[in-house]
Amino acid sequence: MINDKLPKIWHGGDYNPEQWDSKEIWDEDVRMFKLAGIDVATLNVFSWALNQPNEDTYNFDWLDEKINRLYENGIYTCLATSTAAHPAWMAKKYPDVLRVDFYGRKRKFGSRHNSCPNSPTYRKYSERIAETLAERYKDHPAVLIWHVSNEYGGYCYCDNCQDAFRNWLSDKYGTLEKLNKAWNTGFWGHTFYEWDEIVAPNMLSEKREDNVSDFQGISLDYRRFQSDRLLDCYKLEYNAIRKHVPTSIPITTNLMGTYPMLDYFKWAKEMDVVSWDNYPSIDTPFSYTAMTHDLMRGLKGGKPFMLMEQTPSQQNWQPYNSLKRPGVMRLWSYQAIGRGADTILYFQLRRSVGACEKYHGAVIEHVGHEHTRVFNEVAQLGQELNGLSDTLLDARVNAKVAIVFDWENRWATELSSGPSVSLDYVNEVHKYYDALYKLNVQVDMIGVEEDLSKYDVVIAPVLYMVKEGYAAKVEKFVENGGTFLTTFFSGIVNETDIVTLGGYPGELRKVLGIWAEEIDALHPDETNQIVVKGSRGILSGKYSCNLLFDLIHTEGAEAVAEYGSDFYKGMPVLTVNKFGKGKAWYVASSPDAEFLVDFLQTVCEEAGVEPLLDVPAGVETTERVKDGQTYLFVLNHNNDEVTIELHGSQYREVLTDEQVSGNLVLKEKGVLILAKV
């Protein structure tokens, strides 16, 4: 578990008492926290200016008081380091802390995410305050976990970053000869003869307004570099804390799901527990949120994660900040728990009275009392989580299907000039996840370093970049009986975005048994057809596809379906290749949702992968396992009640402790946690 001092699913969230200079409000907060079943408060996230009013002075008296007051009332602390926004005095005295943006403009003091990760000043003072906090609170019994900074993100293009980038490149490549080869600098006369000729790629150099780069290798390495340097800032604080704090107290920082700018698989290696902030928009598919939970779980090989933030009701920063309808907050909380979360924490516990987050939802609203819909829903959930105790803590998700997600592959795809501006890597990954979600098939989201042998089916949509050794890894997996599936625009380049010669899909050509001669790109509104030859499983008839169209030739693979129109009518669009004891599928275009459901049902049936439960549309299933006991979550996202058929199995419904079997009526936004008897 995260910390055995609190052996239950934690319930709490961000608390900013420094925003109210009122003992009466603080006392009321504690009273209402207890009513709501709040047992963890995240403190000190944005308090650097309060903690350090000048270069030589620290003030933690206020923090002592708040930690102690909460602890006296049974509420633990998730202690942040306050470094998410530097103080104004620092920006004034040491302007090197201020970022230079993508357009080459030097930022002024303001907002947050405003510190240059390569600023000597920022690195010095952030490390120092983290260590000062650790020395002060290392033995405090209230502190369950340390929270470094907040939602790291954003790049900088200043001279310090440029110099650090050159050093990073020197360490990576060793010589300019190797760098020039890796970047293909013979193109457009870009050969470098001195390290200081290399400049940061932004709008003043290699980048374009639409995020495409003229030199993908340069821009790809700059993303790697910035991700690494921001990670290094985290590690500076982590190591400063760990000097004084025992390993029994974990250290984390809050991630942001599919956030594009940081390689979270690399970050997770440095985190004791993964935590993340879940803020779906009004039109986010439920399956997308489920996928992101699974991705966060996958960052550390399936270990449970923390839901560090979610709003109790509405947000403030999206175009349309709708309220969570009655029951939705509870429903989405159990969605997180069902997919591996061992905490349910909110932003924020009391609503801010000023600045940009004053309209962001909170447990305690501006009215200041507990007689609100949101508070009552939070309190109900708090009561249920107390009742669950440690039942679900450390429970794992066992999946036989994995989907590969790789940030560097995503970057390379996004930076490429062509073949289509509409190609969205995350969207293509989600399309495959969504089909499996509808089929009630449990999925792990994995990185390219993950062991494949524990899976029956591995799906790698748009595997544009094939890293060294990965093709051999796939071949071994398939040879040993696994099913591998990839798609159009795969196997094109290596890790520095240099095309693999010899024909697409490059190093995957052998295992797939195909050659892609050309890639057609059409407007997303223009479609072709996937015409199945005969039938395979439930796959039959015609389906639609769009976006990109690989024109492929079989080299040992079987053509299962063909294009239905255009000059490549009759050419293969879906192939399967027997390889060793297994098989490898190739989908040469971007199919419609109906095709993916039918296709992946066929793939899973052939691989012996079964769904968790047959349920109506709009109902989500997921399962966790602990000590041999399975816990099946059934979540009704519909606005109407549904009937769940248990097909003769006997269960104990965990939330009510009732024995159930046969057909169950599940109300709108309802939740079941079924332990098999």
Curated annotation (Swiss-Prot):
Similarity annotation: Belongs to the glycosyl hydrolase 42 family.
Annotated control of activity: No activity is lost during treatment with 20 or 100 mM EDTA in Z buffer for 3 hours at 0 degrees Celsius, nor is activity greatly stimulated by the addition of cations. Inhibited by 1 mM zinc and 1 mM copper, the levels of activity decrease to 10% of the untreated control. Nickel, cobalt and manganese at concentrations of 10 mM decrease enzyme activity to either 40% (for nickel and cobalt) or 60% (for manganese) of the activity in untreated controls. No change in enzyme activity in the presence of calcium and magnesium at concentrations up to 50 mM.
Protein's name according to its UniProt entry: Beta-galactosidase BgaA
Record flagged with keyword Metal-binding: yes
InterPro entries: Beta_galactosidase_C (IPR013739), Beta_galactosidase_Trimer (IPR013738), Class_I_gatase-like (IPR029062), Glyco_hydro_42 (IPR003476), Glyco_hydro_42_N (IPR013529), Glyco_hydro_b (IPR013780), Glycoside_hydrolase_SF (IPR017853)
UniProt-annotated binding residues for Zn(2+): C116, C156, C158, C161
GO molecular function terms attached to this record: beta-galactosidase activity; metal ion binding
Record-annotated active site: E151, E309
Temperature-activity profile: Optimum temperature is 42 degrees Celsius. Thermostable at temperatures at or below the optimal temperature for activity, but it is rapidly denatured at temperatures above 42 degrees Celsius. Irreversibly inactivated within 10 minutes at 55 degrees Celsius. Stable during storage at 5 degrees Celsius and loses no activity during storage for 4 months. Retains 10% of activity at 0 degrees Celsius.
Domain of life: Bacteria
Enzyme Commission designation: 3.2.1.23
Keywords recorded for this protein, A-Z: Glycosidase, Hydrolase, Metal-binding, Zinc
Catalytic activity: Hydrolysis of terminal non-reducing beta-D-galactose residues in beta-D-galactosides
Binding site for substrate: R112, N150, W317, E357, K358, Y359, H360
The keyword Transmembrane belongs to this UniProt entry's keyword annotation: no
Biological role: Hydrolyzes o-nitrophenyl-beta-D-galactopyranoside (ONPG), p-nitrophenyl-beta-D-galactopyranoside (PNPG), 5-bromo-4-chloro-3-indoyl-beta-D-galactosde (X-gal), o-nitrophenyl-beta-D-fucopyranoside (ONPF) and p-nitrophenyl-beta-D-fucopyranoside (PNPF) with greatest activity towards ONPG and PNPG and low levels of activity with ONPF and PNPF. Detectable, but very low levels of activity towards p-nitrophenyl-beta-lactose (PNPL), p-nitrophenyl-beta-cellobiose (PNPC), p-nitrophenyl-alpha-galactopyranoside (PNP-alpha-G), and p-nitrophenyl-beta-xylopyranoside (PNPX).
pH dependence, record text: Optimum pH is 6.5.
Subunit structure: Dimer.
Uses in biotechnology: Possible reporter enzyme for halotolerant and halophilic organisms. May also be used in the food industry to digest plant polysaccharides in high-salt processes.
Annotated GO CC locations: beta-galactosidase complex
Matches recorded under SUPFAM superfamilies: (Trans)glycosidases, Class I glutamine amidotransferase-like
GO biological process, one term: galactose metabolic process
